[in-house]
């Protein structure tokens, strides 16, 4: 592997040398050019055409791609996703978490309402999800409004989790500052003893959300960077309103188009 830095060319005989050299450079505050880091995706014969859509309902199309991701032995957590939220004054934040269900009504996930994402969703109830399945060269982006799930549903899911995870949710006042990890260990041990023979109560600050999709984009990578992008959006045109020549009707109120990469 060869990498170019400002004024420096470094060649590595073994991939294992790369992380160590990166650490060395970071310690010296070197400016790093990662331009040469590149991988091949799919060829043109494997392009994602409109005729390859499993359904003209994007949630069903997501289900088809999700099933392929689940079956792929190189993907450990097909339901891992990046959740992006934003404050009312436009400061974004993003983090990885797990999708816990999806359907026509939306995409479900659970978290602590007092976390940064919880506070941002409370003040600005819109979000974006991104699923990236690298071995398949595929990505799905979902945008839409978010609302809290009913308390009964949150309660049901909470008690379906392993008891250690339930206790962990009680221990952690997510995003609050703590003295050290030992603090968490002690709190966890105390609660393990307290709830050894009884049910763990769900914290009031813990629950679920559902994101109602208004935009869903399906991306598939191409080696020549002419990536495939097919986007679905809920349409404003109603009835027999004419559509543009490059806009197509999907199922129900969905419209879809191909975007330039």
Curated annotation (Swiss-Prot):
<feature type="binding site">
    <location>
        <position position="139"/>
    </location>
    <ligand>
        <name>FMN</name>
    </ligand>
</feature>
<dbReference type="GO" id="GO:0005829">
    <property type="term" value="C:cytosol"/>
</dbReference>
<feature type="binding site">
    <location>
        <position position="219"/>
    </location>
    <ligand>
        <name>FMN</name>
    </ligand>
</feature>
<comment type="similarity">
    <text>Belongs to the pyridoxamine 5'-phosphate oxidase family.</text>
</comment>
<feature type="binding site">
    <location>
        <position position="157"/>
    </location>
    <ligand>
        <name>pyridoxal 5'-phosphate</name>
    </ligand>
</feature>
<feature type="binding site">
    <location>
        <begin position="42"/>
        <end position="45"/>
    </location>
    <ligand>
        <name>pyridoxal 5'-phosphate</name>
    </ligand>
</feature>
<keyword id="KW-0288">FMN</keyword>
<keyword id="KW-0597">Phosphoprotein</keyword>
<comment type="function">
    <text>Catalyzes the oxidation of either pyridoxine 5'-phosphate (PNP) or pyridoxamine 5'-phosphate (PMP) into pyridoxal 5'-phosphate (PLP).</text>
</comment>
<feature type="binding site">
    <location>
        <position position="229"/>
    </location>
    <ligand>
        <name>FMN</name>
    </ligand>
</feature>
<dbReference type="GO" id="GO:0010181">
    <property type="term" value="F:FMN binding"/>
</dbReference>
<dbReference type="InterPro" id="IPR019576">
    <property type="entry name" value="Pyridoxamine_oxidase_dimer_C"/>
</dbReference>
<dbReference type="GO" id="GO:0008615">
    <property type="term" value="P:pyridoxine biosynthetic process"/>
</dbReference>
<dbReference type="InterPro" id="IPR011576">
    <property type="entry name" value="Pyridox_Oxase_N"/>
</dbReference>
<dbReference type="GO" id="GO:0004733">
    <property type="term" value="F:pyridoxamine phosphate oxidase activity"/>
</dbReference>
<protein>
    <recommendedName>
        <fullName>Pyridoxine-5'-phosphate oxidase</fullName>
        <ecNumber>1.4.3.5</ecNumber>
    </recommendedName>
</protein>
<feature type="binding site">
    <location>
        <begin position="95"/>
        <end position="98"/>
    </location>
    <ligand>
        <name>FMN</name>
    </ligand>
</feature>
<feature type="binding site">
    <location>
        <position position="161"/>
    </location>
    <ligand>
        <name>pyridoxal 5'-phosphate</name>
    </ligand>
</feature>
<keyword id="KW-0887">Epilepsy</keyword>
<feature type="modified residue" description="Phosphothreonine">
    <location>
        <position position="238"/>
    </location>
</feature>
<dbReference type="InterPro" id="IPR019740">
    <property type="entry name" value="Pyridox_Oxase_CS"/>
</dbReference>
<feature type="binding site">
    <location>
        <begin position="174"/>
        <end position="175"/>
    </location>
    <ligand>
        <name>FMN</name>
    </ligand>
</feature>
<feature type="binding site">
    <location>
        <position position="165"/>
    </location>
    <ligand>
        <name>pyridoxal 5'-phosphate</name>
    </ligand>
</feature>
<comment type="pathway">
    <text>Cofactor metabolism; pyridoxal 5'-phosphate salvage; pyridoxal 5'-phosphate from pyridoxamine 5'-phosphate: step 1/1.</text>
</comment>
<keyword id="KW-0285">Flavoprotein</keyword>
<dbReference type="GO" id="GO:0042818">
    <property type="term" value="P:pyridoxamine metabolic process"/>
</dbReference>
<keyword id="KW-0663">Pyridoxal phosphate</keyword>
<feature type="binding site">
    <location>
        <begin position="110"/>
        <end position="111"/>
    </location>
    <ligand>
        <name>FMN</name>
    </ligand>
</feature>
<keyword id="KW-0560">Oxidoreductase</keyword>
<comment type="subunit">
    <text>Homodimer.</text>
</comment>
<feature type="binding site">
    <location>
        <position position="100"/>
    </location>
    <ligand>
        <name>pyridoxal 5'-phosphate</name>
    </ligand>
</feature>
<feature type="binding site">
    <location>
        <begin position="225"/>
        <end position="227"/>
    </location>
    <ligand>
        <name>pyridoxal 5'-phosphate</name>
    </ligand>
</feature>
<keyword id="KW-0225">Disease variant</keyword>
<keyword id="KW-0664">Pyridoxine biosynthesis</keyword>
<dbReference type="GO" id="GO:0042823">
    <property type="term" value="P:pyridoxal phosphate biosynthetic process"/>
</dbReference>
<dbReference type="GO" id="GO:0030170">
    <property type="term" value="F:pyridoxal phosphate binding"/>
</dbReference>
<dbReference type="GO" id="GO:0005739">
    <property type="term" value="C:mitochondrion"/>
</dbReference>
<comment type="pathway">
    <text>Cofactor metabolism; pyridoxal 5'-phosphate salvage; pyridoxal 5'-phosphate from pyridoxine 5'-phosphate: step 1/1.</text>
</comment>
<feature type="binding site">
    <location>
        <begin position="116"/>
        <end position="117"/>
    </location>
    <ligand>
        <name>FMN</name>
    </ligand>
</feature>
<dbReference type="InterPro" id="IPR012349">
    <property type="entry name" value="Split_barrel_FMN-bd"/>
</dbReference>
<dbReference type="GO" id="GO:0042803">
    <property type="term" value="F:protein homodimerization activity"/>
</dbReference>
<dbReference type="Pfam" id="PF10590">
    <property type="entry name" value="PNP_phzG_C"/>
</dbReference>
């Amino acid at each position: 592997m060869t990498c170019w830095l400002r004024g420096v060319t470094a060649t590595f005989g073994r991939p294992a040398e790369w992380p160590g050299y990166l650490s060395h450079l970071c310690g010296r505050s070197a400016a790093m050019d990662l331009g040469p880091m590149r991988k091949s995706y799919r060829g043109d014969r494997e392009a994602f055409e409109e005729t390859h859509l499993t359904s003209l309902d994007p949630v069903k199309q997501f289900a088809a791609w999700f099933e392929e991701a689940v079956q792929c032995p190189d993907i450990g957590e097909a339901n891992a996703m990046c959740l992006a939220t934003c404050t009312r004054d436009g400061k974004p934040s993003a983090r990885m978490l797990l999708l816990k269900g999806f359907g026509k009504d939306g995409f479900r996930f659970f978290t602590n309402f007092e976390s940064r994402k919880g506070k941002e969703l409370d003040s600005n109830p819109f979000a974006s999800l991104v699923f990236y399945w690298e071995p398949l060269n595929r990505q799905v982006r979902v945008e839409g409004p978010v609302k809290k799930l009913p308390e009964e549903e949150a309660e049901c899911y909470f008690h379906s989790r392993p008891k250690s995870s339930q206790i962990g949710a009680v221990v952690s006042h997510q995003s609050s500052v703590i003295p050290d990890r030992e603090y968490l260990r002690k709190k966890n041990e105390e609660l393990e003893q307290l709830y050894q023979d009884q049910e763990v109560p769900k914290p009031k600050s813990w629950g679920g959300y559902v994101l109602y999709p208004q935009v869903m984009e399906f991306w598939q990578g191409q080696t020549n960077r002419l990536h495939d992008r097919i986007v679905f959006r809920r349409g404003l045109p109603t009835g027999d309103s004419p559509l543009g020549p490059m806009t197509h009707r999907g199922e129900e109120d969905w419209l879809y188009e191909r975007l330039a990469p």
